[in-house]
């Protein structure tokens, strides 16, 4: 059923309360009649594969049809995933244990398969560390990730039991990020999301953005309260002030005061090369979003995604002042989208 089937699934599972809330927001922003806005959102869903979140975040209400056709929407991103990625290989990235095993040379930190280890193995592992990061296996967007301190438990037996209750699969050494990355926001490991596309046997780094935490949680994901900003692919400098999912703009990080635009990401060339090299190890997935941390001695992988989100592309008004979306860039590497 292709595109029609996708639209039918979206209609069946849509959050209609959020849809009508979006209509209200756009009405306040644009002054346009609510009925006209709702009709336009529905039309954009059929014509461009745009969801109501796309409509609001990218301000489709201020774009003409030619401009709208240049944006990577939810539907187009899903089509790109379907075109380039073999779903029978998704488990390699979805399952953190499999990912850590296959891409172990790029992790640069100690970790333990907690789901299969014994209590004594866990206790031995913890002799080296005062705190750890713990992760469930198949969740995304930073869900279930936590930092635990050994001192917060009476015994390591108690700590082990608590991790079992949480159904944790991976425990790992805490990444000590590069001082330049820590300066942006010391409360989280601030990662670089790098998008790779395989084309004619070559791995291309097509886009990258920095994701910064903005809460007490040790995660930076924009779906968990974080913010992001595109990075200049040539220089490795942050290209714009940061934005979050509520469309707030940050010239400086609210927790550190660090000026965001123009900030240089360390080890930029090494980071790009690592992602291209890793992409070639898994040619069955031609479109991957890699989450990379920068440690004092270089880049390392946190995780990777076989359905990388399109909401981090440089398509919000601040990032696309010419009102041209990211689709023309992707079409340089992919035919048929």
Regions found by a protein language model. Name each.
Residues 138, 152, 173-175, 196-198, ...:
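Short, flexible loop/turn elements at secondary-structure junctions
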Residues 129-131, 189-193, 205, 287-289, ...:
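Extracellular structured ligand-interaction cores
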Residues 122, 180-183, 276-279, 288-290:
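Generic recognition of flexible, low-complexity loop/linker segments
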Residues 113-117, 210, 288-291:
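Acidic carboxylate-rich catalytic motifs and surrounding loops in phosphoryl-/glycosyl-chemistry enzymes
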Residues 79-192, 200-201:
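Active-site nucleotide/adenylate-binding loops and adjacent lid/helix of ATP-dependent enzymes
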Residues 185, 189-273:
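ATP-dependent carboxylate/phosphate-activation module, predominantly the ATP-grasp catalytic core
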Residues 17, 249-276, 280-287, 294-337:
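C-terminal active-site "lid" helix and adjoining low-complexity regulatory extension at the edge
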Residues 6, 10-124, 128, 275:
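Conserved N-proximal alpha/beta basic substrate-recognition cap immediately N-terminal to
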């Amino acid at each position: 059923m292709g595109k029609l089937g996708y639209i039918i699934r979206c209609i069946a599972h849509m959050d209609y309360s959020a849809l009508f809330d979006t209509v209200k927001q756009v009405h306040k922003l644009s002054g346009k009649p609510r009925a006209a806005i709702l009709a336009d959102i529905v039309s954009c869903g059929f014509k461009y594969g745009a969801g109501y979140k796309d409509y609001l975040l990218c301000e489709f209400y201020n774009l003409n049809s030619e401009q709208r056709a240049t944006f990577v929407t939810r539907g187009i991103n899903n089509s790109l995933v379907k075109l380039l990625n073999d779903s029978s290989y998704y488990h390699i990235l979805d399952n953190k244990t499999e990912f850590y095993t296959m891409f172990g040379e790029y992790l640069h930190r100690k970790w333990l398969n907690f789901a299969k280890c014994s209590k004594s193995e866990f206790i031995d592992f913890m002799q080296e560390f005062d705190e750890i990061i713990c992760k469930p296996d198949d969740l995304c967007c930073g869900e279930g990730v936590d930092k635990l301190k050994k001192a917060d438990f009476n015994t390591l037996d108690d700590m082990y039991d608590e991790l079992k209750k949480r159904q944790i699969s991976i425990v790992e050494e805490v990444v000590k990020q590069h001082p330049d990355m820590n300066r942006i926001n010391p409360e989280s490991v601030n990662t670089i999301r790098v998008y790779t596309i395989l084309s004619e046997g070559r791995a291309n780094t097509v886009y990258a953005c920095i994701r910064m935490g903005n809460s007490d949680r040790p995660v930076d994901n924009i779906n968990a309260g974080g913010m992001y900003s595109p990075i200049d692919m040539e220089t490795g400098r942050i290209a714009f002030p940061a934005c979050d999912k509520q469309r707030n703009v940050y010239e400086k990080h609210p927790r550190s005061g660090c000026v965001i635009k123009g900030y240089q990401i360390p080890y930029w060339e090494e980071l790009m090369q690592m992602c291209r090299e890793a992409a070639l190890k898994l040619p069955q997935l031609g479109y991957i979003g890699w989450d990379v941390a920068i440690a004092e001695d270089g880049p390392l992988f946190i995780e990777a995604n076989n359905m990388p989100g399109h909401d981090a592309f440089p398509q919000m008004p601040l990032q696309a002042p010419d009102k041209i979306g990211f689709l023309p860039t992707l079409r340089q590497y992919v035919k048929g989208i």
